Amino acid sequence: MSKIILTSFLFSILFFACKNKGNNHPKQTFILEQQRLIHQGDSLTPMRVLVITNKQDSLVLRKKSKAVLFSKQQDSTLALLSKRLVATVQDSATLGVGIAAPQVGILQNIICVQRFDKENEPFEVYYNPTIKQYSKKTQPCKEGCLSIPDRMDTLEIRAYAILLEYDKIDGSHQYEMVEDFTAVIFQHEIDHLKGILYTDYLHEKVHAEGKKH
């Protein structure tokens, strides 16, 4: 039933899915500090991953990220950051299935997710991702985090299916329904954009707050 509801909602907004919103965003570039951090390496250079055990890193990881505002002025920086996120999550020192920009010190609504539901399981980057609907059906899943070294826990609260809304790098707007383990990755990474870590759900109080979707 949950999947039917999600599908119906997806069809109801289908005509708006490919609307280009790039011209609706005011122009804004990354702040100078962010630009310097992004341009410290080329597209194949991994970035340092912030960890919760470092006090300064922890403060950044707990902050909420800002919306990506597309403009020609920041196109090259945004493209470089996107490639460096992929390089970071694929780095042998980390080897994750997803990463969010705040984890490398960039407080922008950007995530990189490995699409296990697609051929060749590619890593893809998403801008301003939000979850519009969650299925009532949940799935238990063992989770870890690049920012929480040497730890894994099983969560019972992740939705089995989600309806995503996001922007692509060209500013076009998309909706997509995602299921199974890939849906878990999206939920985990989007939490990072809100300053939420998966371990927060292990505490009853935060769990209750987190379920207010």
PLM region spans:
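Bacterial Sec-dependent N-terminal signal peptides
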Residues: 1-28
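Positively charged
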Residues: 18-213
